Structure formats: structure tokens, C-alpha cells
Amino acid sequence: RRQRQMCIRDRVQGEIRWMKQHLGRLCRQKHVRTPLAQFAAKSYQSPSPYGNVLIMSPWNYPVLLTLEPLVDAIAAGNTAVVKPSAYAPVSANVLKDLLEECFPPEYVAVVLGGREENQALLQEKFDKIFSTGSVAVGKQVMESAARHLTPVTLELGGKSPCIVEKSSKIRLAARRIVFGKFINCGSNLLCWIT
């Protein structure tokens, strides 16, 4: 139970709290240096929403890796299409019910299904794509996004290296590595240096 709270509830609530605390600063217009050739002008960066964001989440953290990017997308003023993993159908259905209860479909839409639905979504034009999954899926997402010059954030699976330096406290490092490796039934990626 504590693992579930730590892996899902605490992290999502923490993301919401952080965003509420820092959103004003993140949305502010920032003064930036003006090129010398345009010395009489003033230059600014003005944050603006991407538009419609596709969020594709994995099976190993289906709730967390759907809601965390969704919090950020909503805070930035975007609409979102959420595609939970077909390999976590109970979580996907719960997310669909929850999000449909909280948001109108033109603001946050949830698409359930497998590879066929993924392929259909990737044929559509989105203004930003956030995808967590395998390297193979990441390549497909990147290829589809390239057709529309859509910016992409990929979090790809891989190895789980740990580097333990000579100066480390071996017992503490071992406990942390075991904890990190076996949290969420072992479907956790970690890359630590201790």
C-alpha cells in the first residue's frame, strides 16, 4: 500500500503542488538578450501552449505516467488526448472514467485500445507528443511526429545500471538499489550513482 502511495498518489500530488506553486513564474514573459544588429529593440520569450498534446503511457506505471504529463499539459494551457497502455486494461478503464468525469471530451479525451489505435493516433497531427515506452515504440512515435514536425518527449525503457563508487557506503547503496529495483513489482527502471 505504501509503495502504491509513494509511486502514484504522492508523485502526482507533488506534481500538482509544484505546478501550482511555480506556474506564475513559468508563465511570465522573460526578457532575453537582443542581438547587437537590433540594438534598439527589446527581446522577450513568451511561453505559450503547444495546443493539442498526445500522451501515450506505458503498462508499468499506467496511472503515474499518464497523470504527471497531463498535469503539466493542462497547466500549460493545452488540450490532451490520453492513450493508456492496452497492457494495463483495468488502470486504463479507471483513468478513462476518472478523466471523463473531470474534463469535457474536447479538453481531455481518452482513447482505449492497442496497437491499431496507437497507429491511428500517430497518423493524426498533434502539437506535442509525450510517450513513455520501449525503444521500438519510441522510433515509431518519432517517425510519425517527423511527418508533421511535431516536437516529441520520449522516455524510453532500457537497462538499469547502478554505479557504486569506492567512497560509497556499501550497505546503504545496496539497500537503495534493492529498494529501487523491486519497487512496483520490479517493473521500475533506475539509474543511480551512489
Spans of model-derived segments:
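Residue-level signal for inorganic ion chemistry
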Residues: 16, 77, 108, 129, ...
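Short, small-residue-biased leader/transition segments that mark boundaries at the very start
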Residues: 3-8
